[in-house]
Amino acid sequence: MEHNGSASNAGKIHQNRLSSVTEDEDQDAALTIVTVLDRVATVVDSVQASQKRIEERHREMGNAIKSVQIDLLKLSQSHSNTGYVVNKLFEKTRKVSAHIKDVKARVEKQQVRVTKVETKQEEIMKKNKFRVVIFQEDVPCPASLSVVKDRSLPENEEEAEEVFDPPIDLSSDEEYYVEESRSARLRKSGKEHIDHIKKAFSKENMQKTRQNFDKKVSGIRTRIVTPERRERLRQSGERLRQSGERLRQSGERFKKSISNATPSKEAFKIRSLRKPKDPKAEGQEVDRGMGVDIISGSLALGPIHEFHSDGFSETEKEVTKVGYIPQEGGDPPTPEPLKVTFKPQVRVEDDESLLLELKQSS
């Protein structure tokens, strides 16, 4: 009995130990599960955060694309505005060039006049027949010349002065004190304006302005149309010209082929369908009318079959070969008239022929 009691106690102790071990293992497993769940939660959080970042980036990209589209629209508008401004500038330059041409013509005329005046002045200077005109402001012109004698001097001294100082002969050169008139002022101002215009439209200034204008125009052209695009446009124009020439040549060939393919009047033989024996048949044929009988074996249609044998179909060839088939027993019936129609047949190799189609009238 004591032995059994000790054995039962030992079994209980062993069970307690096993239960403690299993509890420890369960705790460890629970801890591992919790740690794994924490890691999974952190991973899920990181994934969600990355998704949010990606969405934000997508939004930023959409906004950037919208801004780029807006910039492109603005650029197109500015491009159209620049094109309009350039057209206006070209019109203004044309007007300015026309005005410059007019001014040049006027300046040339004025130069001719100036050269004439200079030549006249040189001739007058050579002849030495001219009058000196002195301009003085606010000084009245003396009407007469008066000589005042000094009473203090004796008569002998006066005679000596007259001997040593002879009077000046003013017959050749006469002096006039003339006020400047309005016409003279206008002439002076006109000459000054002409001098300014000559300086402004001199060769050096015109060359400089042309160079600057050419530089600006070339810059605007390169901005509007690139040289590569110009080359492409030139090549496309050449291609269009070549295609137009080809079309013109093909049209000429087509006309020539049509004119060569038209048959002559001698190629067809028109006659009555059949000569009736009875007067009744003649009356019926008169009522029915005249037709066209084209015999395949005749010499008139021989050249058509030789030159245009490809243009007929098999059925048409059979129709041309078929003659008037007599019925068994009795008189041969009057054949029905045939309709002759001509159709031009166009081929790819630019050879045209007439298609002869024979249809029996119903």
UniProtKB/Swiss-Prot annotation:
Phosphoserine modification, residue list: S152, S171, S172, S353
Tissue: Expressed at much higher levels in cardiomyocytes than in non-cardiomyocytes.
Protein family membership: Belongs to the CAVIN family.
Compositional bias annotation for Basic and acidic residues: 227-255
Phosphothreonine PTM positions: T334
Coiled coil as UniProt keyword: yes
Annotated coiled-coil segments of the chain: 100-120
Protein name as catalogued: Caveolae-associated protein 4
GO biological process terms, semicolon-separated: cell differentiation; muscle organ development; positive regulation of transcription by RNA polymerase II; regulation of gene expression
Assembly and binders: Component of the CAVIN complex composed of CAVIN1, CAVIN2, CAVIN3 and CAVIN4. Interacts with CAVIN1, CAV3, ADRA1A and ADRA1B. Interacts with CAVIN2; this augments the transactivation of NPPA. Interacts with MAPK1 and MAPK3.
Region (Disordered): 1-24, 227-261
Function summary: Modulates the morphology of formed caveolae in cardiomyocytes, but is not required for caveolar formation. Facilitates the recruitment of MAPK1/3 to caveolae within cardiomyocytes and regulates alpha-1 adrenergic receptor-induced hypertrophic responses in cardiomyocytes through MAPK1/3 activation. Contributes to proper membrane localization and stabilization of caveolin-3 (CAV3) in cardiomyocytes. Induces RHOA activation and activates NPPA transcription and myofibrillar organization through the Rho/ROCK signaling pathway.
InterPro entries xrefs: Cavin_fam
CC terms in the record's Gene Ontology section: caveola; cytoplasm; cytosol; plasma membrane; sarcolemma; sarcoplasm; Z disc
Subcellular location: Cytoplasm, Myofibril, Sarcomere; Cytoplasm; Cytoplasm, Cytosol; Cell membrane, Sarcolemma
Modification Phosphotyrosine, positions: Y324
Keyword annotations from UniProtKB, A to Z: Activator, Cell membrane, Coiled coil, Cytoplasm, Developmental protein, Differentiation, Membrane, Myogenesis, Phosphoprotein, Transcription, Transcription regulation
Underlying gene: Cavin4
